[in-house]
Amino acid sequence: MKTSRKRHILVTGIHRSGTTFVGKMLSSAPGTGYVQEPFNPEYGVTGVDIWYPYIRQGHVSESYYAEIVRNIVSGHAVYRKKSADGDHFFKKTGKRLLGSRDYLQYLASTKMPGSRRLIIKDPLASLSSEWMHKKFDMDVIILLRHPAGFIASTQRLGWNYYFLSDIMTQTQLMEEYLHEILAPFNIASMKQWQKGALLWQCIYSILDVYAERNPSIKIVRLEDISLAPEEMFRELHKHLELPFTKKTAHKIQESTGSNNPVNAPGGKVHHLQRNSRQLSNAWKRSINRNMAIEIRKLAGPVGEKYYGKDW
């Protein structure tokens, strides 16, 4: 088995849970390389065609996904060349010729000389994280975000699709984990934000089991990082055996200081410089009391375990 210092690191959790922020901060440590969402079926590596794929030992698709992961960590994976609707002509041409920015960053992270630990930031690999931990000896950090904070974040971006139908097409996943959770609900009649809260319960019910079975898989609440960012990142670096440098400390302070805005500007998806102390409860500005009560119910027992009964 590899020593901990050589293990690649998967930073995962539901989408909009802070995986980009945490992944970027960890990747400031020397000897690391950042990999952006290889399991994203829209702009990640070729071969992944479903959202939130569930893979475990003995799964019918295990060998197929094992080859994909081997290619990712060896630097041989290829990202899709997908242009965004707002890309201008030269940007579209550049992507066709050179590949996306994520692919170029991936190449830099995997092809540079020297032994590098990859920081694989990917919420969409969350349901396969236990398998990746066991089969590929990866360290796994699971980011947990308040269910109402998750809904508020997706609503800010106008993201109204929560991947429940993609999850429900995965027979083994449904049989082993989710049938009991989803059976009582008429999902077709639910509002989109209700589906989002139910997805939150589905994802974290499974990830909670993974962490219970594997003590070295670490669950971290985004809110705890927001309230004490340097302290929490020092703890994460120690757990992962990553050096905590002055550069890392400065980057964390710069990204979480009180002079930064609470919310990202406009519809920006990723904005790393935020007022972290105010961010943890920012959802209360856009989620009314009745909606919060409904989200709490839909988040289920795992929501109560990590965030209590009183919001």
Give the residues covered by each predicted segment.
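Short beta-strand segments
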Residues: 11-13, 36, 119-121, 142-144, ...
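Short hydrophobic/aromatic-enriched beta-strand-loop microsegments
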Residues: 33-36, 137-145, 162-164, 245
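Short catalytic/ligand-binding loop motif for oxyanion handling, primarily in non-cytosolic enzymes
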Residues: 23, 41-44, 126-129, 148-153, ...
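Conserved phosphate-donor/acceptor-positioning beta-strand/loop module used by diverse small-molecule
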Residues: 121-122, 135-156
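A conserved segment at the C-terminal end of the G1
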Residues: 20-32
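PAPS-dependent sulfotransferases, especially Golgi type II membrane carbohydrate sulfotransferases
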Residues: 1-10, 15, 107, 174-204, ...
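PAPS-dependent sulfation machinery
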Residues: 37-120, 163-188, 276
